[in-house]
Amino acid sequence: MPEANADSFTAIVFNDLHQRPHIFEALLKQIKDIDYDFVVFNGDCIDDPANHEQATRFASLLTEGVHGDRIPTLFIRGNHEIRNAYSIGLRKHFDYVGGKTYGAFNWGDTRIVMLDCGEDKTDDHREYSGLNDFTQLRNEQVAFLEQELSSKAFKKADKRILIHHIPLYGCDNLCKELWEPFLKKAPFNVSLNAHTHRFAHHPKGSLGNNYPVVIGGGKNPENATVMILEKKKGELRIKVLNTEGKVLLDIVE
């Protein structure tokens, strides 16, 4: 980790790869000349894990692709990581701080808050046979948000980035009713999301959002994206590229 007063970094964010190596490889080509400090996989990358071999094979491909042996690599759960026979076993492969799939940390003078939206369907949906309890997970994060947003680390940060898989804006999200009362006043510079398989940029205030929202694309060559975050002193730049290297978004917050 960098020094607490470090004011510059570059990070890469992938999402919704759905275990498609050719999509990952196409996006890697677009960032091959970038010297990045850490990487985030924002959900639905190791989707519907059936068994140990399947899950670890693709997880290894991802970490090797971004040099995870020397570059910090973060995995945020999407709704598809918590489906199928090996979904519980998948958790064992990641070092969740305090055993929680959500949390916050500082990268230099930037605060990064990660949330876990759980499933995109209610717990009583017929698919789950009464075995899911993501309502409790969402409620847990209400207390976490209340504590985090009032913390010294959050308040002192130069920039603040929110990351979670299912968008609160531009998409139905079961977390919105619980979390929005806290987030609508929180001074985040940007929220990075995924899930919809459609790249989108919702400027601050366009959907009642208190911060800009950037949603990554999907799992096919024509809609997959990779995000590049570049923090240089007081400036945070967010770029989004497609599989051909076309710049879909380039904003400074």
Q: PLM features: what roles do these ranges have?
A:
Residues D16, G43-D44, G78-N79, H165, ...:
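Active-site glycine-centered loops adjacent to acidic/histidine catalytic or metal-binding residues
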Residues L149-C171:
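Short acidic, glycine-rich surface-loop motifs adjacent to enzyme active sites
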Residues M1-V13, H18, E25, K29-D35, ...:
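Acidic, histidine-bearing metal-coordination/catalytic regions of metal-dependent phosphoesterases
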Residues K29-P49, N189:
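Active-site metal-binding motif and surrounding structural segment of the metallo-beta-lactamase
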Residues M1, E53-S150, L178-V190, A200-K219, ...:
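Extended active-site neighborhood of metal-dependent phosphoesterases/phosphodiesterases
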Residues L162-Y169, N189-F199:
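Histidine-centered catalytic micro-motifs
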Residues L17-H22, D47-E53, I82-A85, L168-N173:
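Acidic-and-aromatic substrate-binding clefts and catalytic sites of carbohydrate-active enzymes
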